[in-house]
Curated annotation (Swiss-Prot):
This is Guanine nucleotide-binding protein G(s) subunit alpha. It comes from Homarus americanus (American lobster). One of its GO terms (biological process) is adenylate cyclase-activating dopamine receptor signaling pathway. A lipid is attached at G2 (N-palmitoyl glycine). Belongs to the G-alpha family. G(s) subfamily. Pfam families: G-alpha (PF00503). Residues 204-213 are annotated as: G3 motif.
C-alpha cells in the first residue's frame, strides 16, 4: 500500500513540475509577445476614396519589403487592362453627355466608339487585338482628348492618361508591368489590409482601409492601440465630386472627414501625419489654369503664401500658393480644437514617386518614434 502511495506522490510531483515548467514557458512567451507588440509601430492609413492610400502601401513594399515578384507583377496585368478599358469606356461614354457635348474630330472613328461601348463593356470581355487598336486610334482623336481635358465634369480614374499613353506596351504578349505600372494601377480597396515591414530593426504594421463612405464603418475596428494615423488627401481633387455623392466636392469631403477624425473622442491622444498627396496632379491643374481653385474655395482669392513656405527650385509661385492654402485649410481644423494631446504633421507627397515617399517616410520616422514612446508613457 505504502509503495503505491509513494509512487503516486512521486507522479504528482513530476506532474506539478511539468505544469509549472509549461506555465513558466507560456508566461515567458506572453512577455515576449508583449514586448514585440509594444515595440511595433502601428500606422493606420485613413482618407477619402481615391486619395492614394493603397499606393502608399505599395511604396512601403517597394522600399522596405522585397517589392513585387515577377508572378505578382503578372497578376496585375488583368487589373491594368481593366483600367484601360474603364478609362476609354468612361471618356467616350461622356462625350455626348457633357454640356456642351463633344464630337469626334474624325467622325469615321464612330464605329470604334460603338465597339468600345457595345462590345468592350461586356462582363466576359477578353481583350482581343482589335480592342487595343480601337483604343489607340480613339486616344489620338482630338475630340476624345478634349473630353479627357474635362474629366472633372465626370468620374475618371487618375491613371487614365498614364495607361492610355502606354496601350502599345500593355498590348504586347510578353508584357510585364513595371513598378510604376503597379503603383499607378487602380483597384478599389474593400475591407482592411495589413502590411508588415521593418526599417532599421523597427517593426511597422500599416493598416489600409477602404475610403469610400460605405467602407468607413470598418475603420473603428482598427483604432485600438494605434501609434499614429496617416491621413491621406488628394489635393488635386479640389475641382472634383464624389463617386458616391455627385453633390459633394471631394476636397471638402476630405476636410470634413479629417475634422471628424481629429475631433473623435477615441482618437484625442493619437497624432496625425497629414499626407497632402497628388502634388503632381495639383501642379498640372493650377498651371493649366482651366479649373481655378478660387472657383471652388473662394477664400483662396485673398490667400497669401505664408512666410514658412519652402519653394522648390523653378516651382511656380501660384502652385506654391495653392498647395499651402490647402495645407492651411487642414491646419485650421487641427489648431482650432487642439488640446495639446495630439498634433498634426503635414507633408507634401506624390504617392507614385518612390523617392518622394522614401524622403517623407524617413522624415516621419522620428515623429512616429516620439508618438510610440508617448503611447507607452516612456516620454
Amino acid at each position: 500500500m505504502g509503495c503505491f502511495g509513494s509512487a503516486g506522490a512521486k507522479g504528482d510531483a513530476e506532474e506539478n513540475k511539468k505544469r509549472k515548467e509549461a506555465n513558466k514557458n507560456i508566461n515567458k512567451q506572453i512577455q515576449k509577445d508583449k514586448q514585440v507588440y509594444r515595440a511595433t509601430h502601428r500606422l493606420l492609413l485613413l482618407g477619402a476614396g481615391e486619395s492614394g492610400k493603397s499606393t502608399i502601401v505599395k511604396q512601403m513594399r517597394i522600399l522596405h519589403v522585397d517589392g513585387f515578384s515577377e508572378e505578382e507583377k503578372r497578376e496585375k496585368i488583368h487589373a491594368i487592362r481593366c483600367n484601360i478599358r474603364d478609362a476609354i469606356l468612361t471618356i467616350t461614354g461622356n462625350m455626348s453627355t457633357l454640356t456642351p457635348p463633344i464630337a469626334l474630330e474624325n467622325p469615321a472613328h464612330q464605329f470604334r466608339v460603338d465597339y468600345i461601348q457595345d462590345v468592350a463593356s461586356q462582363k466576359d470581355f477578353d481583350y482581343p487585338e482589335e480592342f487595343y487598336e480601337h483604343t489607340e486610334m480613339l486616344w489620338k482623336d482630338k475630340g476624345v482628348q478634349a473630353c479627357y481635358e474635362r474629366a472633372n465634369e465626370y468620374q475618371l480614374i487618375d491613371c487614365a492618361k498614364y495607361f492610355l499613353d502606354r496601350v502599345h506596351i500593355v498590348r504586347q504578349t510578353d508584357y510585364t508591368p513595371t513598378e510604376q505600372d503597379i503603383l499607378r494601377c487602380r483597384v478599389l480597396t474593400l475591407g482592411i489590409f495589413e502590411t508588415r515591414f521593418q526599417v532599421d530593426k523597427v517593426n511597422f504594421h500599416m493598416f489600409d482601409v477602404g475610403g469610400q463612405r460605405d467602407e468607413r464603418r470598418k475603420w473603428i475596428q482598427c483604432f485600438n492601440d494605434v501609434t499614429a494615423i496617416i491621413f491621406v488627401t488628394a489635393c488635386s481633387s479640389y475641382n472634383m465630386v464624389l463617386r458616391e455623392d455627385p453633390s459633394q466636392n471631394r476636397l471638402r469631403e476630405s476636410l470634413d472627414l479629417f475634422k471628424s477624425i481629429w475631433n473623435n473622442r477615441w482618437l484625442r491622444t493619437i497624432s496625425v501625419i497629414l499626407f497632402l498627396n497628388k502634388q503632381d496632379l495639383l501642379a498640372e491643374k493650377i498651371r493649366a489654369g482651366k479649373s481655378k481653385l478660387e472657383d471652388y474655395f473662394p477664400d483662396f482669392a485673398r490667400y497669401q503664401t505664408p512666410l514658412d513656405a519652402t519653394v522648390e527650385p523653378g516651382e511656380d509661385p501660384e502652385v506654391v500658393r495653392a498647395k499651402y492654402f490647402i495645407r492651411d485649410e487642414f491646419l485650421r481644423i487641427s489648431t482650432a480644437s487642439g488640446d495639446g494631446k495630439h498634433y498634426c504633421y503635414p507633408h507634401f507627397t506624390c504617392a507614385v514617386d518612390t523617392e518622394n515617399i522614401r524622403r517623407v517616410f524617413n522624415d516621419c520616422r522620428d515623429i512616429i518614434q516620439r508618438m510610440h514612446l508617448r503611447q507607452y508613457e516612456l516620454l
